[in-house]
Structures are given as structure tokens and as C-alpha cells.
Amino acid sequence: MPEHAPDGVRPARPHHKLTADGRRMREVLTYSRRGSRFSPRQQQAWAAYAERWWVPDEAVDDPGFTLAGCFERSAPLIVEIGSGIGESTVALAAARPDHDVVAIEVWRPGVADTLGRIGAAGLSNVRLLSVDAVWSMAHLVEPDSLAALWTFFPDPWHKAKHHKRRLVTASFARLVAGRLAPGAEWRLATDWADYADQMVEVLDAEPMLEGGVVERWAERPVTKFERKGIAAGRAITDLAYRRRGAAR
């Protein structure tokens, strides 16, 4: 069962971790926190919807926090890592009203945009967290429970010296495989060829998963990041990996 870290540690936010003597702990993160200034439209969306659909970091740090407790019902759970401005989140969640969707995004203007999209679409099955995705998968998601995981256009960390910060690694693949329900899918997309190659190498090597490169997922809308990649001349790669075992 997932467990929170001991009292006094802010586990969901590695950039806040301290050593025993109070010094800031250096962590290898899979994300970077970009600017947090809101546009007037984003500020309006945040004011209107954040209290309803965004889970504060301090709430996630509470030892009694659960993802199920974020919703007013019991439903199959989907997690999206790196939801950006919510284009995929809202479209895919709207098509799955019987599922609950937790979108993890640390960029607050993107969260605000997503909140606005949720409100405009009239959805009630999406919640947003702005905490570390790797920690969240390990400590908030129950084993064998996820109905699906979506990871579209994760930060490519394209410089070789930064590859260690990429999200899709062997250890993360093993973690995800153990959190997916049997038969559940992990959908990924990237516009960086070398990251796509790394994803295939890592995920093919995980014995609990099966899959590979697939045709573009028709349900996934063309997002801002995808358009940017196409404009730069980069090919888009979609991948789908399934947790081995009979679907429930």
C-alpha cells in the first residue's frame, strides 16, 4: 500500500526537501518549474475554479490524503502526467464520464488554463495536482489500480547531460507497470526521436508490459506542444503499452 513519508518532510515537492540538519536537499527532478505569472484570463479561471478542482500541495502532503477522496464517487481512475494547458485532459475526460481523471501539472499557468477548459466543458470528473509525478505514482496510486496512464509530450531534456532527468526510465516503467490494472494501457507521445527510442528500449525491457510504437491515437487532440514540434520539423511518435494479464 502507498505510504506517505515521515512527519516533517514535504514528500510531494522534492524541490522543498531538506536534510536532517535543515539544508536544502539536491534532487534530480523530471520537471522544471517555469514562470508562474497569470494572464488576466488565467487569473479569472483560477479564482473561479481552483478551490473546486485543484488540490493544494499542502493537502497532498497530509498523511491522510487519498486520490479517491478528491472525488464524490467511486470510479475507475486515470492519471495524466504533464497535462500542460489541458487540451488532451479535457477532451479525453469528456469522452470518459464514468472515469475519474487526475491530471498532474506543476506549471501553474497551465493549471489555470486547464481549470478554464474544465469549466467551459462542464466537467466534474477531473482534479489537478501540482506535485511530483514520480512520488505521486509511488505514494498515492494503489498497486494494480489504474485504468490508464497518459503521458503526452513529457519534457525531452534533449541535452545529453540532462537525459537523467527524463521521466521514462527503467525504474519508473517498473513502478507504472505495478500501478496499472491488468490489461490497462499507458499511452505516450513525443516529438523527439531519441526520446521515442529511449521509451521503446525501456518499455520493451519491462516484463510486465507489452506494446510499442502505434499509429497516432485518434482520440488524442492535436495539442499546442504537438503543433510546435510539427512546425519545427519533428516527427510525432505515439506509443501504447499494456499491463500484461487479463483485463478486469
UniProtKB/Swiss-Prot annotation:
Positions contributing to substrate binding: K159, D191, T223, K224, F225, E226
* EC number(s) per entry: 2.1.1.33
Top-level enzyme category: transferase
InterPro entries according to UniProt:
SAM-dependent_MTases_sf (IPR029063), tRNA_(Gua-N-7)_MeTrfase_Trmb (IPR003358), tRNA_methyltr_TrmB_bact (IPR055361)
Pathway membership, UniProt? tRNA modification; N(7)-methylguanine-tRNA biosynthesis
Q: Does the keyword S-adenosyl-L-methionine apply?
A: yes
Q: Which reaction does it catalyse?
A: guanosine(46) in tRNA + S-adenosyl-L-methionine = N(7)-methylguanosine(46) in tRNA + S-adenosyl-L-homocysteine
UniProt entry tagged with the keyword Transferase: yes
> Where along the chain is the active site annotated?
D155
Residues reported in the UniProt entry to bind S-adenosyl-L-methionine: E80, E105, D132, D155
Provide any one GO MF term from the record: tRNA (guanine(46)-N7)-methyltransferase activity
- Tell me the superkingdom of the source: Bacteria
Q: Which keywords annotate this record?
A: Methyltransferase, S-adenosyl-L-methionine, Transferase, tRNA processing
Show the GO cellular component annotation of the record: tRNA methyltransferase complex
Provide the function of this protein: Catalyzes the formation of N(7)-methylguanine at position 46 (m7G46) in tRNA.
UniProt lists the family membership as follows: Belongs to the class I-like SAM-binding methyltransferase superfamily. TrmB family.
Write the protein's name: tRNA (guanine-N(7)-)-methyltransferase
Species annotation: Nocardioides sp. (strain ATCC BAA-499 / JS614)
Gene that this polypeptide is encoded by: trmB
